[in-house]
């Protein structure tokens, strides 16, 4: 916030900010955006793009909190899986800030129910996640409709070649702000690896969970099937666990996430994609039951614990064949 806010209050100041989740970035871009809004002019002035519905709602909620003493400022979350008609109605009534997932925003653009010609500021939050989820073409189409004369801010946990390419394409003389070192995981996280035979993996997981009775954490699996199987086994064995993956309906996912947020649920077994929109500050543990494919994904997972000055533990349960991959990570 110290780095970003003063810079963003200026004009024509593009920013690439490399920051882990949990570093206060919503306020870093949100406060200057709110400051720049002309409330009397009820047209879209700022656009925030983010990868998931959950993050979209969370950012919109934060912006509403920050601006609650500014009479008449309107923030509209635009996301799939909800009524498009109510979003179209809100756009007709006039909004100042649009927080959107790329897919639903494109849909509205194609229906000619939203115009981006008055946008002065664009934020791409968790840009690396949006690219990982295959939104590159959507982002290109959206930014082609936004005026060239704009401020563009790109927030990403890691500096991948794709992020470098997209910032070169859309940002002008961007200031690069790095909170912590590039691509590093947060220093408040202790990393632990347990090597076991493949057949003993679930037994090892139970031992770990038993060793930390106060655990409040996420267990990451690689597939939806494995996620459901592990969650079912843990529940059968009496643990306070549940699953989160793409085969659940939106209503089921919302229920599970809400239970987890308010700590009615101790252990969430999840896929990477399903957990993307979940933002919880005080997780004690992240357990990699299935190793991710690359260091970036591992950094994202482990960055969910050890936030906001607290300490956390990232545990990987690997089999003998995965030792080389773990060493690379």
Predicted segments with their positions:
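Conserved helicase RecA-like core
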Residues: 1-329
């Amino acid at each position: 916030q110290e780095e970003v806010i003063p810079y963003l209050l200026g004009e024509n100041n593009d920013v690439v900010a490399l920051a882990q989740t949990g570093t206060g970035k919503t306020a870093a871009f949100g406060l200057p955006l709110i400051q720049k809004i002309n409330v009397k002019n009820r047209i879209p002035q700022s656009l925030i793009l983010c990868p998931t519905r959950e993050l979209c709602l969370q950012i919109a909620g934060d912006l509403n909190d920050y601006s609650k003493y500014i009479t008449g400022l309107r923030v509209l979350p635009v996301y799939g899986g909800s009524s498009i008609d109510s979003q179209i109605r809100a756009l007709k009534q006039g909004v100042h800030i649009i927080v959107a997932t790329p897919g639903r925003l494109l849909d509205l653009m194609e229906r000619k129910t939203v115009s981006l010609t008055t946008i002065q500021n664009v934020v791409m939050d968790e840009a690396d996640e949006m690219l990982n989820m295959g939104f590159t073409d959507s982002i290109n189409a959206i930014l082609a409709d936004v005026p060239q004369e704009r401020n563009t801010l790109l927030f990403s946990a890691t500096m991948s070649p794709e992020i470098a390419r997209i910032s070169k394409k859309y940002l002008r003389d961007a200031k690069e702000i790095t909170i912590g070192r590039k691509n590093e995981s947060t220093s408040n996280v202790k990393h632990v690896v347990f090597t076991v035979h493949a057949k003993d993996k679930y037994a090892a997981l139970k031992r770990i969970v038993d060793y930390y009775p106060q655990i409040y954490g996420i267990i990451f699996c690689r597939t939806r099937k494995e996620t459901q199987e592990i969650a079912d086994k843990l529940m059968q064995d009496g643990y306070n666990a549940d699953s989160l993956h793409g085969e659940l309906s939106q209503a089921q996912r919302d229920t599970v996430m809400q239970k987890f947020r308010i700590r009615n649920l101790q252990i969430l077994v999840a896929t990477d994609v399903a957990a993307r929109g979940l933002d919880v500050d005080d997780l004690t543990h992240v357990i990699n039951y299935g190793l991710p494919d690359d260091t970036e994904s591992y950094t994202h997972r482990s960055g969910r614990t050890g936030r906001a000055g607290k300490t956390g533990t990232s545990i990987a349960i690997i089999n003998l064949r995965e030792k080389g991959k773990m060493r690379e990570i």
